[in-house]
């Protein structure tokens, strides 16, 4: 419930732009959010393994 409330709180436009922070669009996690995708590293990894994100694949060398 708390995470849901924080997601709603993050959607509101703050009075000052410096108070804005990124939050994952899928799970609501506030840390390690990739700006390009708008999702956290955990969700990004999961979606990449499923092949849901076009052009993104796991690196191997």
From Swiss-Prot:
Key word RNA-binding present: yes
A GO term from the CC aspect: small ribosomal subunit
Record note on cofactor: Binds 1 zinc ion per subunit.
GO biological process: translation
GO molecular function per UniProt: rRNA binding; structural constituent of ribosome; zinc ion binding
InterPro entries per the UniProt record, alphabetical: Ribosomal_uS14 (IPR001209), Ribosomal_uS14_bact (IPR023053), Ribosomal_uS14_CS (IPR018271), Ribosomal_uS14_sf (IPR043140)
Binding site for Zn(2+): 24, 27, 40, 43
Cofactor: Zn(2+)
Name of one Pfam family that matches: Ribosomal_S14
Gene3D superfamilies: 30s Ribosomal Protein S14, Chain N
Keyword match Iron: no
Keywords: Metal-binding, Ribonucleoprotein, Ribosomal protein, RNA-binding, rRNA-binding, Zinc
Protein family (similarity comment): Belongs to the universal ribosomal protein uS14 family. Zinc-binding uS14 subfamily.
Assembly notes: Part of the 30S ribosomal subunit. Contacts proteins S3 and S10.
Function of the protein: Binds 16S rRNA, required for the assembly of 30S particles and may also be responsible for determining the conformation of the 16S rRNA at the A site.
Name of the featured protein: Small ribosomal subunit protein uS14
Organism expressing this protein natively: Coprothermobacter proteolyticus (strain ATCC 35245 / DSM 5265 / OCM 4 / BT)
């Amino acid at each position: 419930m708390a995470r849901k409330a924080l997601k709603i709180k993050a959607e509101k436009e703050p009075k000052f732009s410096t108070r804005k922070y990124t939050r994952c669009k899928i799970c609501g996690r506030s840390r390690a959010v990739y700006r390009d995708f708008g999702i956290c590293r955990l969700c990004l990894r999961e979606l990449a393994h499923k092949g849901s994100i076009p052009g993104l694949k796991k690196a191997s060398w």
